[in-house]
From Swiss-Prot:
Keyword Transport: no
Cross-referenced InterPro entries: PMDh-L-like_dom
Cofactor: [4Fe-4S] cluster
Positions that bind [4Fe-4S] cluster: C125, C298, C355
Protein name: Phosphomevalonate dehydratase large subunit
Catalytic activity: (R)-5-phosphomevalonate = (2E)-3-methyl-5-phosphooxypent-2-enoate + H2O
EC assignment: 4.2.1.182
Cofactor note: Binds 1 [4Fe-4S] cluster per subunit.
Amino acid sequence: MCGVGKVYLDRTEERMYDGEFGETVQQSMEILVALGDIYGAERMVDISSAQVSGVSYKTIGDAGLEYLEDLRARGAGVKVASTLNPAGMDLQRWREMGFSEEFARRQIRIVEAYSAMDVMNTCTCTPYLIGNVPLRGSHVAWSESSAVSYANSVLGARTNREGGPGALAAAICGKTPEYGYHLQENRRATLRVDVECELSGSDYGALGYITGKIAGEGVPYFTFTGHPSADDLKALGAAMASSGAVALYHVDGVTPEYMEASPDEAGDSITVDAGDILEAREELSTTDDDPDLICLGCPHCSLDEIRRIASFLRKNKPACDLWVCTSAAIGSAASRMGYTDVIEAAGGMVVSDTCMVVAPVEDLGYEVLGVDSAKAANYVPGMCGLDAVYDDWMNLIRP
């Protein structure tokens, strides 16, 4: 073992750090060692997969594009299965969405740079729905906040909330520093949340919004009167990651590590009732005006969510434009099942690779977005400069 700063490296890691595997591996290992020093890691661990953010041209701009194309030119490549976060547009249907040629050209260059590094251009915030499904206890380096929450909490994998460059560096080296949620002692509950009312639909996002603001970077432990679905947990985790910085939570009797979470030792506890949920739902809306665009799929819709939307749209037409956001893989399955035809016959559009948060929706003339995602409601006013209306998707479609 060789010590570099506070982090000990094995012989292979030391060779990476010394440049024996090339400049880009060396640069990436330097990033990982620096992160390890900052956060007090003692060593590196192998990762089984990576999930890389910093994909939308809207968010990374020309500086990010140049950084990625420089890595590509220097022959960078990933060592583990790696998937991409959403881009700023549907890579196939961007013209139908109304985005400019210039934006599209630069967005495509970003995705091509990642593809050249062997990062799978899946462009989704739900990699666990399309095959990037780490085993319980395995170490990964994921960066999308809602995906990090799902991986840690629902799958029982181990990841910190990586920045885009850190996740890419981990993917290139196949390593990440062992600190934070990679360590068992940091995965115990710090806040007990007793939910005293029945929840459905966007109530889970409202609950996450409440909890994230209180928990901050802590680890909530929930007790429910009902049994949340996987899609409910997806919405809950995404909301907590946006209103706070929650990257791991436990649900009594549901999530894989709940028996090891030590909820009785949590330092704080809260109760949440129906009045709290109603107040949060009202707070998440910034206007009483009707939306001129409904955006569903933050995080990206599962196939079952699209099935239910299509079933509803057989008898109901949206009062305004409608986007149903998902991954290309789930979108393809929705097309095969006939769900896309139903949604688009009703006036909606199934869009892949992107979402309302990282797409330049503000350039399309919309003023009010209707969302059933607390994460989207939290981000849209700041990132898009638009008002948000928060409600169940059925209420948004049929006001």
